[in-house]
Amino acid sequence: MNKTISLVAALMMISGSVAAQTFDEAFNAQRAMNGKGHSFTFEGKSYTTDHPEEVAAAAPANAANAKQLLADAKAQYAKALEVDFGWTLTKGLLSSANKALEAGEFRKSMEISARAQYHSRMGVAQYHQSQKEWLMAVPN
């Protein structure tokens, strides 16, 4: 797969049709090729392929951090619900994260909360994308 991608990139450079890449495009390409925890350079700066929620979940597993991450996930879910793009899966994740927190399973709670927060963030992004596509679909 990596050889194919490299070959395509090389052919694009030879043909002179290389388009400028946005950060999101570069991040998504690096994440798809290398998974989380990979470092890459974009416009001279170093970044990792970790989502912000994964970074937050990597904090020390204790009650305070687990409570904060769950609260952040609930707040992000509320934003997704405001635009009517709250996924039903997320509600179950929040419930599971809360149960793990109550059981003292802080690492588990943090990991589930991070997933819930990510899904909510993607729900809001999905809303914005649908609005943009809707505007593009409406004839002038």
Language-model features: locations:
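Long, charged/polar, soluble alpha-helical segments
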Residues: Q21-N140
